[in-house]
């Protein structure tokens, strides 16, 4: 009886399934595929802007002898590194940041969160080697502020530079020109800068997924940025004007959370018209891939931060959640249509030419769904110097919504722990 109903109403069923598949492809194009080339465009724009800024500074320096009061040089920069127990990683990072080929003045401020003995000894040794290195620490007193928030805040307050760049201890600059290229984008019309950071590939499935997540997050933020919206910030490789940080109250809005300080600050206070995105490899940081538990904790933290957003930022992330389901829904609808058509022809023993137009449309939808996800991100992945995921992108897209549900469940289960609490010094 069910089969008789399907065959008698197949025109309506087929039309509905193909229209539903087309709707999913349209959503994918509008909310994802159309913006996957933005990163490549931003790399080109950044390189052009850096070239102009370099030429401008060279002209200023060349005419400095004739015009004494002509502004010249690059801004003073303080690189703040919040560190807890990462002594080995910090030992690898410090020579990279202390030996930057920067034409201006800069310093490195290490904010010691936990006052670990190994970290303290390491900082003492490096302080004797380089006059650029300064240290500060979180005082051993009762406090209700998460350690990283307090460490970054103390580092910013201790900074003597006009600009502060926050980087993690497990990251490494792309080259000795990293700071110079970064500084060329710290212009007077900007208060907040987000640089690109991604994990070093290790060949594992979790690493490949984590790298793809950060690329997709960057693309989402660039799409929102094109419409005047700032969607959060990564944990590392962001720069802020020190006076701006003080004027907006720093991390005041995220004090009740044990994470999300830079994310919430960027969403609430960063003006898109005074914010810049740096995507070029020259200003990139490469981060050591953390453990799976750390990656999961970061995903849960980001999910909780997104839940607390409002206004346009909330709608953008809701759109991301909707489009995440489109590949699965498309696969379901087009597979159902194909299965029904095969079953109908198998029962009759001949191909029904009356459905040729429908079959051509279904085949076209399959081609679009299979090849467009492979082709669209090629330019951006090449510009970001990331390896193209290849066929893995199909698996990633199909698993993404289910992983989002899993992270949301973890977030709900752990939400009672997302409160400001007393932090003993033994942490």
Regions found by a protein language model. Name each.
Residues 1-68, 377, 404:
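N-terminal membrane-anchoring/stem segments of glycan-assembly enzymes
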Residues 164:
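Short aromatic/hydrophobic "clamp" motif used to bind/position activated sugar donors
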Residues 75-78, 107:
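Cell-envelope/extracellular polymer assembly enzymes that use nucleotide-activated donors
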Residues 192-217, 246, 252-317, 423:
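Catalytic donor/gating beta->alpha subdomain of glycosyltransferases that bind UDP-sugars
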Residues 324-415:
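Membrane-embedded multi-pass helical conduit in multi-pass membrane proteins
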Residues 95-142:
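Acidic donor-binding segment of Leloir-type glycosyltransferases
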Residues 168-184:
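Acidic donor-binding/catalytic loop of UDP-sugar-dependent glycosyltransferases
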Residues 137-147, 151, 155, 181-252, ...:
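Long helical/loop segments within the catalytic core of UDP-sugar-dependent glycosyltransferases
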């Amino acid at each position: 009886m069910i089969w008789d109903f399907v065959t008698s109403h197949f025109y309506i069923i087929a039309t509905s399934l193909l229209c539903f598949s087309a709707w999913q492809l349209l959503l994918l194009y509008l909310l994802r595929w159309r913006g996957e080339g933005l990163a490549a465009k931003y790399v080109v724009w950044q390189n052009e802007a850096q070239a102009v800024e370099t030429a401008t500074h060279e002209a200023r320096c060349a005419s400095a002898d004739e015009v004494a009061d002509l502004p010249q040089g690059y801004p003073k920069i303080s690189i703040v590194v919040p560190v807890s127990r990462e002594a080995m990683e910090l030992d690898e990072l410090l020579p990279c940041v202390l030996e930057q080929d920067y034409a201006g003045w800069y310093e490195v401020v290490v904010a010691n969160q936990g006052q670990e003995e190994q970290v303290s000894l390491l900082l003492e040794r490096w302080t004797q080697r380089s006059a650029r290195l300064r240290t500060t620490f979180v005082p051993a007193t009762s406090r209700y502020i998460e350690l990283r928030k307090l460490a970054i805040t103390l580092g910013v307050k201790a900074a003597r530079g006009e600009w502060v760049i926050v980087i993690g201890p497990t990251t490494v600059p792309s080259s000795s020109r990293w700071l110079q290229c970064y500084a060329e984008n710290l212009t007077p019309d900007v208060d907040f800068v987000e640089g690109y950071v991604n994990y070093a590939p290790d060949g594992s499935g979790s690493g490949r997924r984590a790298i793809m997540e950060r690329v997709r997050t960057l693309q989402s933020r660039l799409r929102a940025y094109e419409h005047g919206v700032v969607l959060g910030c990564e944990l590392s490789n962001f720069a802020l004007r020190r006076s701006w940080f003080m004027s907006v109250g720093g991390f005041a809005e995220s004090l009740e959370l044990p994470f999300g300080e830079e994310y919430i600050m960027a969403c609430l206070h960063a003006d898109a018209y005074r914010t810049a995105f740096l995507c070029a490899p020259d200003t990139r940081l490469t981060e050591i891939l953390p453990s799976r538990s750390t990656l999961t904790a970061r995903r849960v933290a980001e999910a909780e931060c997104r839940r607390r957003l409002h206004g346009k930022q909330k709608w953008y992330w809701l759109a991301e959640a909707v489009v995440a389901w489109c590949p699965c829904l498309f696969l379901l609808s087009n597979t159902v249509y194909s299965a029904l058509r095969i079953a109908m022809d198998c029962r009759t023993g001949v191909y029904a030419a009356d459905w040729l137009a429908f079959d051509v449309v279904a085949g076209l939808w399959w081609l679009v769904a299979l090849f467009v996800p492979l082709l669209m991100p090629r330019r951006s992945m090449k510009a970001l110097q990331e390896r193209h995921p290849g066929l893995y992108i199909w698996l990633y897209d199909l698993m993404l919504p289910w992983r989002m549900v899993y992270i949301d469940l973890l977030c709900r289960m752990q939400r009672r722990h997302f409160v400001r609490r007393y932090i003993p010094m033994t942490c």
